[in-house]
Swiss-Prot record:
Annotated TM spans: 10-32, 53-72, 87-109, 129-146, 181-203, 235-257, 262-284
Similarity comment: Belongs to the G-protein coupled receptor T2R family.
Extracellular side: 1-9, 73-86, 147-180, 258-261
One Pfam family this sequence matches: TAS2R
Source taxon at top rank: Eukaryota
Organism: Pongo pygmaeus (Bornean orangutan)
Localisation: Membrane
CDD domains associated with the record: 7tm_TAS2R7-like
Membrane-side (Cytoplasmic) residue stretches: 33-52, 110-128, 204-234, 285-312
UniProt name for this protein: Taste receptor type 2 member 9
Primary location recorded for the protein, binned into one broad class: membrane
PROSITE patterns the UniProt entry points to: G_PROTEIN_RECEP_F1_2 (PS50262)
Summary of the function given for this chain in its UniProt record: Gustducin-coupled receptor implicated in the perception of bitter compounds in the oral cavity and the gastrointestinal tract. Signals through PLCB2 and the calcium-regulated cation channel TRPM5.
InterPro entries: GPCR_Rhodpsn_7TM (IPR017452), TAS2R (IPR007960)
Gene transcribed to yield this protein: TAS2R9
Length: 312
């Protein structure tokens, strides 16, 4: 019988999982249907599909890890399953962060106007550049996740069962923990790329605004609006990542912290919020996805209205 804290944990994780799978699944479904209709796919659609799929995998593996931890506390920590979950988690987490950095770079190259030969060359080769980054992101994530497969969880912690379930941590956990922390620090690179993209977008916006003021036009042009939308999207991602990444690192080192099980439970709830909530920000920030989402809401509203029982 789960305790009150465990019951709250299960309810929150199940709710966030449902919302996250629905939001990211919606992104994949709408873009794939559009792909089949037009028999062509745009670069932004490829990025969003890749990002949404990685987020679905991340949501699922975080949830599975939490449920296994509660349901099989005495065997899960020493099983092969925990190694598989950890590898998939590492791959999905890193690929999600890298694909998001690809989205930020796409916004930068598509919208910003920077008078530098190298930047101009990148804009001309935007399709090849972004596809190369996407492929590189996939390979980097794969290499990092494979490097985790050395039975490190066996050295990370040992679960013992007493009268009440307790988590008994050993000194041998330290090498595995530090290795995982070191590998996961590599996920700071996508964050830095997003920060650079934000800085350059802001620089481009300031310069563009000055040009408008010199031309004495008293209204926002499409370029200014595009700059603002891109900057807002990158800022939101950076804010979410600032919350997500430290919590993820704490979870990675939870074996070194007292009450490690409680830390993992709180960490799961916080980390699953990032891929769940960001999907709806992406939907509302993309005209095609936003239109499809609003159309679906109108359909649901009409459907519920028709099913409403008649009251004389």
């Amino acid at each position: 019988m789960p305790s009150a804290i465990e019951a709250i944990y299960i309810i929150l994780i199940a709710g966030e999982l449902t919302i996250g799978i629905w939001g990211n699944g919606f992104i994949v479904l709408v873009n794939c249907i559009d792909w089949l209709k037009r028999r062509d796919v745009s670069l932004i659609d490829i990025i969003l599909i890749s990002l949404a799929i990685s987020r679905i995998c991340l949501l699922x593996v975080i949830s599975l890890d939490g449920f296994f931890m509660l349901l099989f506390p005495t065997t899960y920590g020493n099983s092969v399953l925990v190694s598989i979950v950890b590898i998939v988690w590492t791959f999905a987490n890193n690929s999600s962060l890298w694909f998001t950095s690809c989205l930020s770079i796409f916004y930068l190259l598509k919208i910003a106007n920077i008078s530098h030969p190298f930047f101009f060359w990148l804009k001309l080769k935007i399709n090849k550049v972004i596809l190369a980054i996407l492929l590189g992101s996939f390979l980097i994530s794969l290499v990092i996740s494979v490097x985790m497969n050395d039975d490190m969880w066996y050295h990370l912690f040992k679960v013992s069962h007493e009268e009440n379930i307790t988590w008994e941590f050993k000194v041998s956990k330290i090498p595995g923990t530090f290795k995982q922390l070191t590998l996961n620090l590599g996920a700071m690179v996508p964050f830095i790329l997003c920060l650079i993209s934000f800085s350059l977008l802001l620089f481009s916006l300031v310069r563009h605004t000055k040009q408008i003021q010199l031309x004495a036009t008293g209204f926002r042009d499409p370029s200014t609006e595009a700059h603002m939308r891109a900057i807002k999207a990158v800022i939101i991602f950076l804010l979410l990542l600032i919350v997500y990444y430290p919590v993820f690192l704490v979870m990675t080192s939870s074996a070194l912290i007292p009450q490690g099980k409680l830390v993992l439970m709180i960490g799961d709830i916080v980390t699953i919020t990032f891929p769940s909530s960001h999907s709806f920000i992406l939907i509302m920030g993309n005209s095609k996805l936003r239109e499809a989402f609003l159309k679906m809401l109108r359909f649901v509203k009409r459907f519920l209205r028709r099913r409403k029982p008649f009251v004389p």
